[in-house]
Every structure is written in C-alpha cells, then in structure tokens.
C-alpha cells in the first residue's frame, strides 16, 4: 500500500534538528524526509518558513548548524519533495498557519504532521492532521 503524501509543519523540522534522541518521532520524520522514505509536499512559502526558523540565531546556537549547513538540508528536502501550489481553503484555527490549510486543501489524500495543539484539535480536519508520534506509529 502506498503511503499518503504528508505536509510536515515547521515545528516538526525544527524539533527533528534539535532532539538528541535519534529514535524520536521528529528525528525519524526528518531523517525519512532527507532519505525520501515517504512522499511529502512542499511549496515555496513553507520552504521559506523552514529556512527562516532554522537560521534564527537562537536556534542555530542550539542545533549547531551553520547557515550553509541548514541551507544544504533545505536543498535536500526540496529535491525529494512533491511541489504543489496551495488553493483557497477554510480558515485555519491559527491565522499564521493558513498556508498549511491551503496546502492541505490541494489534495484530499494529504495529511499534515504537526506538534501544534491548536491544529491537532481542529475537529474539521480530524484524521488529516496528526502528531509526529501518530505518523511514526502508523508507519510501523
């Protein structure tokens, strides 16, 4: 059976870089994206948000990567991604995440992986918005 394509929220990418536990769900998701182990979706604004977060000085101090190293990771992610253009969608629970809702609306089979509790609790997207641990558990 083919796995559905996923959208990976920025908080999962950042947590994957920050964790010291290689077996943690966020680390496994980031490693899977870098290794093209499952299909995932990007678009320009999401990749830009990944970059903006990963190169923040406070985060760089914690993950220890240079800007060039962070950009190399982003390049790898972009090379393995399915690129889609977002479409209009219902309002997201958090207006700052509207672009994720619009990307989710592009295809009925997409699933969003996030650690954002507000997004995870959205009743209208139940089953389409899952936690990193739920994604990893379903993959096993």
Language-model segments: residues:
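Acidic, PIN/NYN-like endoribonuclease modules and their adjacent C-terminal/linker elements
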Residues: 90, 94, 105-113, 117-140
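Short, active-site-adjacent cap segments at secondary-structure transitions
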Residues: 13-14, 48-49, 119-121
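Residues that scaffold the ATP/ADP-binding catalytic core of kinase and kinase-like folds
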Residues: 15-17, 53, 62, 122, ...
């Amino acid at each position: 059976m083919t796995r559905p394509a996923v959208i990976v929220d920025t908080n999962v990418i950042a947590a994957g870089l920050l964790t010291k536990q290689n077996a943690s769900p966020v680390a496994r998701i980031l490693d899977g994206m870098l290794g093209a182990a499952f299909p995932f979706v990007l678009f320009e604004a999401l990749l830009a948000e990944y970059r903006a977060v990963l190169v923040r000085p406070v985060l760089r101090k914690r993950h220890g990567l240079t800007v060039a190293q962070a950009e190399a990771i982003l390049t790898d992610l972009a090379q393995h991604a399915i690129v889609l253009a977002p479409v209009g969608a219902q309002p997201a629970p958090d207006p700052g995440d509207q672009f994720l809702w619009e990307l989710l609306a592009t295809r009925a089979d997409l699933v969003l992986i996030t650690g954002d509790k507000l997004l995870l609790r959205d009743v209208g997207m139940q089953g389409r918005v899952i936690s990193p641990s739920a994604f990893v558990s379903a993959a096993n």
